[in-house]
């Protein structure tokens, strides 16, 4: 099989195939080449038929999509429109030679469709004609992309047009398609993965987990102009390790913390498991209000408690529980725990920039051979904005020595203090309760101290701190609460239970209502003293009640009142009983 490529001065055609045979007859498809791609454009193809003779090439090129046929033996073709070129072969070159025939056009006719047939008209012959023949394999259907330059010459043989013709014949290289690879995601069966989300490592928690001493902090920004920029709560409860040979269980606490803005209602409830689930709610109907004008006052409330926790194996321990000192074999020390901090910024202009709550409960290790249970306390802390209602309730058992010291050693209360009532109620001593293993204890009942071999000391626990900044101009930049409960180590052979205390602290903003109630068991001696050792409370306090109820045998000291609980007069220490 041979292909043909013919270039005339006024027209260019190409043929994929021509017939083989001695007669030299060929037919095929002639197509215009696209100048931009240097490739045949098959939408401009025409049917090409002709005869191939040693002396001349008679070529008929029909119009587009028009078939044509050879009707004459040599010179005459069909009755369809088209052009006929009479092309002479170059002298000295065989017409059958593979590679091409160098020709010149001697005559050209135009075939025109007429009513009776086809009219033939002589037309101007092209100035040159180059006919190329190339061999085609039977399996191939495409023309070669290049032609040997030696076979491309002008009709005169001068070779002037050789390079030009070669450039025309060369086809543009194929355009490579580049496929982008997408990121492969390998999934396990049944798992769903969000490719945009980082996967965080989840720590493994041991079987015995220390119920974190999660100190609750409720912050109420200004109701008018304050903007809460960022609140970060990152409590971490670490593992509880190696608490062998503990004979008496201690009940963990449960904590509920809710904060709403607008009609913000918040309640933090901590209930202890000892047949006693006490919850004291300071409702909005109670007639207690704090004046709207308190400037530059911060009164931290610190309650230092010395606690002792009696453990049983695999039991959970509340590090905030106070326990009376009981002499035991070795000395065990419980590091202090900062319990809670409540901060109420200004109602008008304060801006809360950032609040970070990051309590950390560290590991509790090696508390062997403890024989008596101690009941943890329950705490209720609530803060509301708008109809803000707040409750802070801490309840603990009897037989404890409670000291509620409200002091502002580093703060100054500079404004209005009105109507302070302090009622002290003393309960009668109730009978002594001796515990056995597995028995339930009334948290309000006192238990006699039982001497044992050695002495165990548990350092004080910082219970709560309430800070009320200025209502007008103070700006709270950053508040960080990071209480840490450190390790409890080596508290062996404790034989007598001690009941923790209960404390109620409530702070409200808007219809802010606050009550601080400390209840202890009977048989205790209570002393309620309101003094201003280093503070200045200069003005009005509206409707604040501080109720302190304690049992006989207990000594309670109220050293100072926070800004949320201002005094009537720093020099007036009247105690009102009701």
UniProtKB/Swiss-Prot annotation:
Ranges: Sequence repeats: 180-272, 304-425, 428-557
Location of the protein in the cell: Secreted; Host membrane; Host cytoplasm, Host cytosol
Superkingdom field: Bacteria
Membrane topology: Multi-pass membrane protein
Renumbered residue ranges of the record's region 3 X approximate tandem repeats: 180-557
Region entry Disordered, spans: 144-169, 516-578
Phosphoprotein found in the keyword field: no
Keywords: Host cytoplasm, Host membrane, Membrane, Repeat, Secreted, Transmembrane, Transmembrane helix, Ubl conjugation
Gene Ontology CC entries for this record: extracellular region; host cell cytoplasmic vesicle membrane; host cell cytosol; membrane
Physiological role: Secreted effector that hijacks host cell SUMOylation during A.phagocytophilum infection and is important for the pathogen's intracellular survival.
Record protein name field: SUMOylated effector protein AmpA
Classification lineage: Bacteria, Pseudomonadati, Pseudomonadota, Alphaproteobacteria, Rickettsiales
Gene of this entry: ampA
């Amino acid at each position: 099989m041979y292909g043909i490529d013919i270039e005339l001065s006024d027209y260019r055609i190409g043929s994929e195939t021509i017939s083989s045979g001695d007669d030299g007859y060929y037919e095929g498809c002639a197509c215009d080449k696209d100048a931009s791609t240097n490739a045949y454009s098959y939408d401009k193809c025409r049917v090409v038929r002709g005869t191939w003779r040693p002396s001349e090439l008679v070529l008929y090129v029909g119009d587009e999509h028009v078939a044509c046929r050879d009707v004459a033996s040599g010179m005459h073709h069909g009755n369809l429109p088209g052009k006929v070129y009479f092309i002479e072969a170059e002298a000295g070159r065989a017409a059958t030679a593979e590679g091409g025939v160098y020709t010149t056009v001697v005559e050209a006719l135009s075939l025109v469709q007429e009513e009776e047939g086809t009219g033939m008209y002589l037309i101007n012959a092209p100035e040159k004609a180059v006919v190329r023949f190339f061999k085609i394999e039977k399996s191939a259907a495409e023309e070669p992309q290049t032609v040997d330059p030696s076979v491309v010459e002008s009709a005169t043989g001068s070779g002037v047009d050789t390079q030009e013709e070669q450039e025309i014949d060369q086809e543009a290289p194929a355009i490579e398609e580049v496929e982008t690879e997408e990121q492969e995601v390998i999934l396990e069966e049944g798992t769903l993965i969000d490719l945009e989300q980082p996967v965080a490592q989840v720590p493994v928690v041991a079987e015995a987990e220390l119920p974190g001493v999660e100190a609750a902090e409720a912050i109420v920004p200004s109701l008018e102009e304050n903007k809460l920029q960022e609140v970060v709560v990152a409590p971490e409860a670490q593992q509880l390790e190696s608490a062998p040979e503990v004979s008496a269980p201690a009940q963990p606490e449960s904590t509920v913390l809710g904060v709403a803005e607008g009609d913000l209602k918040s309640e933090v409830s901590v209930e202890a498991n000892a047949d006693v689930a006490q919850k004291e709610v300071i409702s909005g109907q109670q007639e207690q209000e704090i004046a709207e004008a308190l400037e530059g006052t911060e009164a931290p409330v610190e309650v230092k408690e010395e606690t002792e926790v009696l453990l049983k194996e695999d039991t959970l321990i509340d590090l905030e529980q106070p326990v009376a000192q009981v002499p035991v074999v070795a000395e065990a020390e419980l590091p202090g725990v900062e319990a809670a901090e409540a901060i109420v910024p200004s109602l008008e202009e304060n801006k809360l920039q950032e609040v970070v709550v990051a309590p950390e409960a560290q590991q509790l290790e090696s508390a062997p051979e403890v024989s008596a249970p101690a009941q943890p306390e329950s705490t209720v802390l609530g803060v509301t904005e708008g109809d803000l209602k707040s409750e802070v309730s801490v309840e603990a058992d009897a037989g404890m020595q409670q000291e509620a010291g409200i002091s502002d050693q580093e703060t100054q209360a500079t404004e209005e203090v009105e109507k302070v009532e302090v009622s002290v109620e003393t309960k009668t001593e109730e009978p002594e309760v001796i515990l056995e293993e597995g028995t339930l204890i009334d948290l309000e009942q006192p238990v006699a101290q039982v001497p044992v071999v050695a002495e165990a000391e548990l350092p004080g626990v910082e219970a709560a701190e309430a800070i009320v900044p200025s209502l007008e101009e103070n700006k709270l930049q950053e508040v960080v609460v990071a209480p840490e409960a450190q390790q409890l180590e080596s508290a062996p052979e404790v034989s007598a239970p001690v009941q923790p205390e209960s404390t109620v602290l409530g702070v409200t903003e808007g219809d802010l209502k606050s009550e601080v109630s400390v209840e202890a068991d009977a048989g205790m001696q209570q002393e309620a003293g309101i003094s201003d050792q280093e503070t200045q409370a200069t003005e009005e306090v509206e409707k604040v009640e501080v109720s302190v109820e304690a049992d006989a045998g207990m000594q309670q000291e109220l050293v100072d009142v926070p800004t949320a609980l201002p005094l009537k007069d720093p020099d007036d220490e009247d105690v009102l009983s009701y």
